[in-house]
């Protein structure tokens, strides 16, 4: 099993202290967490993309380029790239550049994105967001694979023998499809034979397990090799301590502060107490053995081989945040790496393959 640390770069008051850091300090914290993730042996570091409050993750290629300059080994993920909002040509240019600067460490998780405010900002409607996502991905995918692209697009100017530079480092970059609530992204992933990354954050296990089951069904429908299928999954929170009692009591003020924010913002509340959150959500809060057991329970339902945890302290003090990550790596990840297999591909740059025959995009 491989392990990622991911941030959406939420920028709001600390759920425990009520203090909001200056924007510059919040970005510095992201960079520090990326360095910590590499130091502790995480396999990847991811940055989300949101274009509305309370997030400041509107430019993941810029942030990841800085992370690439500071690190040497860790793979760099987007989580997720909101292709339904983006011009696929510009998205390709940004990420192909980042891929070169990082020496082929880039992996993308793509999706339509969430939030009404960012849809309004980019004039994307709920009715066309899935079509935009599919069209943008097909064009993006072809640009990465072909020197010239022709595409009869609906949501951007058509392309005719278009050349887009720089040509890529990885051939091709690995693209995962983020999945949260709907079957459209799952089917898109299965259609192209791409890996799936389940959000697995907001709700109990059942809806996510059903979408992963559907992904496997569609993967088979499209005739792909069952042995090449790969699934990743997120987690709703992380705090590992020596005992379950210590973990829950330390995390309690973090949970209660976050719950208060959700209620103030009018967001739906799924878990009313920290005990319910620990029991029924995907949060990894407890002793090392409890966390190991919980990941195994989820693996039995998902069959996932990649797991992401929160990169941010999210209300924990910096020493407790570091102690938790260190304990996770030394006593949890070390066991799970042996118990659960890796994804069915090399964890490194995708080597060049012979050029494919140019085909027009059917969008």
Language-model features, listed with the residues they occupy:
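N-terminal beta1-alpha1-beta2 module of alpha/beta enzyme domains
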Residues: 1-71, 75, 171-173, 345-352, ...
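Conserved, mostly hydrophobic/aromatic
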Residues: 3, 37, 41, 49, ...
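Active-site mouth loops of central-metabolism enzymes
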Residues: 13-27, 81-89, 171-181, 279-288
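Alpha-helix-loop-beta-strand connector modules within alpha/beta enzyme cores
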Residues: 54-78, 132, 136, 326-340
